C-alpha cells in the first residue's frame, strides 16, 4: 500500500501523513512522482485537495499532464480517493474528481467509498481521513504494514 497526496495549503499532506503514520508508511507528494509510479497489485490511497475553481493543486496538474501524455495502462491498479474542499464554493472537491476521472480513464479501479472532507463542516480533516482509510483497508482485507 502506498499513500499519495496533492496539497495546496498543507491540509492534504497532513491527512496523508496521519494515515501513513497509522500504517507505518510514508506519505508521498504527487508533485515529486513520475507518471510511471503506479503498479498493478498495489493499493494506493490518494488524498487530494481542490484549488481555485475546481482545479488540481499546483504541481499536481503537471503530474496529471504527465499521466495524460504517457497514457500508461493502469489495468490492475487499485486506488481509493479522498478529496478535500469547502462546500461553500461551487467546485467543492472537484480537484480530486479530476484525478479520479483520469485514473479511471487509464484503466485503474477505484475501490471503497469516495472519501471527502468539507472544510465548511467543522470536522477535523485528519479524523475524517483516518476513518475513511481504516474503512478502505478493512473492506479490502489488507493487513496493515508496520
Give residue ranges: language-model regions.
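Long, contiguous binding/interaction regions
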Residues: 28, 33
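Short amphipathic alpha-helix with an adjacent loop that forms part of the alpha/beta core around
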Residues: 34-40
Amino acid at each position: 500500500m502506498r499513500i499519495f497526496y496533492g496539497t495546496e495549503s498543507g491540509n492534504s499532506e497532513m491527512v496523508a501523513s496521519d494515515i501513513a503514520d497509522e500504517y507505518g508508511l510514508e506519505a508521498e507528494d504527487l508533485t515529486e512522482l513520475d507518471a510511471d509510479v503506479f503498479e498493478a497489485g498495489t493499493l494506493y490511497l490518494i488524498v487530494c485537495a481542490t484549488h481555485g475553481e475546481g482545479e488540481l493543486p499546483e504541481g499536481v496538474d503537471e503530474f496529471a499532464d504527465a499521466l495524460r501524455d504517457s497514457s500508461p495502462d493502469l489495468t490492475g491498479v487499485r486506488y481509493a480517493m479522498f478529496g478535500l474542499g469547502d462546500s461553500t464554493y461551487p467546485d467543492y472537491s472537484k480537484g480530486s474528481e479530476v484525478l479520479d476521472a483520469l485514473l479511471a480513464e487509464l484503466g485503474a479501479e477505484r475501490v471503497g467509498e469516495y472519501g471527502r472532507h468539507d472544510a465548511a463542516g467543522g470536522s477535523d480533516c485528519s479524523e475524517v481521513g483516518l476513518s475513511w482509510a481504516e474503512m478502505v483497508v478493512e473492506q479490502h482485507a489488507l493487513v496493515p504494514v508496520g
